[in-house]
Regions:
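Nucleotide-sugar donor-binding patch of glycosyltransferase catalytic domains
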Residues: 124-153
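Short acidic-hydrophobic, aromatic-tinged amphipathic segments that line or gate anion-handling sites
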Residues: 82-86, 145-163
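Generic N-terminal amphipathic, Lys/Arg-enriched alpha-helix
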Residues: 1-16, 25-27, 31-32
């Protein structure tokens, strides 16, 4: 059975409040029948996995990690499905190949992922108070889309999940190639 995938991207190291938000979000996303995809490094992916696993409805394939290197070690014990791509930063395009992208914090890697998501016509939801996600919340990156990055930087977990569901149900269309 296919479950919609939600890419969660952001800083390797996040504040305690951001980690708490991610943990609760991952827990609730499992309840709603979603899978989560991360880039696999740092506390973000560990927190997403812990939040998902804390939900009694968690299955053994609810968290997917796409690692930049060939070594699976960084994600062992912190993900259900581990894919060591060996693609380095190029794997960012794979990470955001999801129905919706949720961005929190972020430096250059997150900015790259947000740009790919934008080019792929993926809805991007910005949460948290730091980094590129916060800076680009409510903005349009260029002319490719008439929409903007969805600003959920002050939203509750329930509001974020509602926005994710809304994007999937009403506005989502698959990328058909760069034009």
């Amino acid at each position: 059975m296919y479950k919609p995938q939600i890419a969660i991207i952001g800083s390797r190291e996040l504040s305690p409040s951001s980690l708490s938000l991610l943990n609760a979000l991952a827990h609730e996303l499992v309840s709603q029948g979603y899978r989560m995809v991360t880039g696999g490094l740092g506390t973000l992916q560990q927190t997403v996995h812990e939040g998902a696993k804390s939900n009694p409805q968690h299955t053994d394939c609810d968290t997917i990690v796409l690692l930049p290197g060939f070594d699976p070690e960084p994600a062992i014990g912190h993900a259900d499905v581990i894919i060591p791509t060996g693609l380095d930063a190029y794997r960012n395009a794979l990470v955001v190949n999801a129905e919706v992208v949720v961005a929190i914090g972020g430096g250059a890697g997150t900015l790259s992922e947000m740009a790919f998501a934008w080019q792929f016509n993926r809805p991007i939801i910005a949460i948290g108070k730091d980094g590129w996600a916060n800076q680009l919340a409510g903005e349009s990156l260029d002319h490719r889309q008439s929409s903007k990055i969805i600003d959920c930087t002050s939203s509750s977990v329930e509001e974020i999940v509602s926005q994710i569901s809304n994007q999937i149900m009403n506005q989502y269309k698959r990328h058909q190639g760069i034009s």
